[in-house]
């Protein structure tokens, strides 16, 4: 199972493209999600991610997340996600491999020590917020993969291993344009696995997928495990 922003959007987590919050609408995603953006204005980047952290904490997993967790009770299912929220975990999925990091993990930008201290309260979005400071003097940053950074080794290794051994790869809610994650479906197809795309929109994967289901995750995933054999035949 490879999930992307679409499944979280159903729970109320806006994507960069859909985020209409007035404070952030005028910024290019690169300014808020890159190593360069952090160097230029860490207060702005911290404010953006702190707001996202609290936004995600206030929403709930949807039927798509719950269906994936239920699949793990009946089949050997690996959950790989490009999302930085914890909705898969709150729905009951274990383990979940986060390719792009997590809004709920933090580390020092200088020494990389994990940060488990308190976070500033945020009742309303604020354009700039001062990040906490590590004991070494470095600023605390979200443990997110930004533009210009490599994917974390362990989640990526698990994702490749799961893809190489999979009979079926379900790709849900992803645009299929962000690499290297988008290459997992290509890897599965090259090894003879079936690739099932769940997305209400056509993507670059649609033409090569074994099966494309034009529904949202919450519409398609409940009951899909039982229907897959017939659909693929």
UniProtKB/Swiss-Prot annotation:
Catalytic activity of the protein: N(6)-acetyl-L-lysyl-[protein] + NAD(+) + H2O = 2''-O-acetyl-ADP-D-ribose + nicotinamide + L-lysyl-[protein]; N(6)-succinyl-L-lysyl-[protein] + NAD(+) + H2O = 2''-O-succinyl-ADP-D-ribose + nicotinamide + L-lysyl-[protein]
Any GO MF annotation of the entry: histone deacetylase activity, NAD-dependent
Binding annotation for NAD(+): 4-24, 82-85, 173-175, 199-201, 217
E.C. number: 2.3.1.286
Database matches in Gene3D superfamilies: SIR2/SIRT2 'Small Domain, TPP-binding domain
Pfam families, sorted: SIR2
Subcellular location: Cytoplasm
Residues engaged in binding Zn(2+): 108, 111, 134, 136
Keywords assigned by UniProt, alphabetized: Cytoplasm, Metal-binding, NAD, Transferase, Zinc
Predominant localisation class: cytoplasm
Main enzyme class: transferase
The record's note on its domains: 2 residues (Tyr-49 and Arg-52) present in a large hydrophobic pocket are probably involved in substrate specificity. They are important for desuccinylation activity, but dispensable for deacetylation activity.
Function according to Swiss-Prot or TrEMBL: NAD-dependent lysine deacetylase and desuccinylase that specifically removes acetyl and succinyl groups on target proteins. Modulates the activities of several proteins which are inactive in their acylated form.
Name the UniProt record assigns to this protein: NAD-dependent protein deacylase 2
Gene source species: Mycobacterium avium (strain 104)
Gene, per the UniProt record: cobB2
């Amino acid at each position: 199972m490879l999930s992307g922003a679409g499944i979280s959007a159903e729970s109320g987590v806006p994507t960069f493209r859909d985020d209409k919050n007035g404070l952030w609408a005028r910024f290019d995603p690169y300014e808020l999600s890159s190593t360069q953006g952090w160097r230029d204005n860490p207060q702005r980047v911290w404010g953006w991610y702190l707001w996202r952290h609290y936004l995600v904490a206030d929403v709930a997993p949807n039927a798509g997340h719950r269906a994936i967790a239920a699949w793990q009770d009946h089949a050997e299912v690996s959950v790989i996600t490009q999302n930085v929220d914890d909705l898969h975990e709150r729905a009951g999925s274990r383990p979940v491999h986060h390719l792009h990091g997590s809004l709920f993990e933090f580390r020092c930008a200088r020494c990389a020590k994990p940060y488990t201290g308190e976070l500033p309260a945020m009742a309303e979005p604020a354009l700039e917020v001062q990040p906490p400071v590590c004991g070494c003097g470095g600023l605390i940053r979200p443990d997110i993969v930004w533009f210009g950074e490599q994917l974390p080794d362990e989640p990526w290794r698990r994702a490749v291993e799961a893809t190489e051994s999979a009979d079926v790869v379900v790709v849900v809610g992803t645009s299929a344009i962000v690499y290297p994650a988008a290459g997992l479906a290509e890897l599965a197809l090259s090894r003879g696995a079936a690739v099932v795309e769940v997305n209400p929109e056509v993507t670059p994967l649609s033409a090569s997928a074994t099966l494309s289901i034009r529904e949202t995750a919450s519409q398609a995933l409940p009951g899909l495990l039982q229907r897959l054999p017939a659909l693929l035949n």
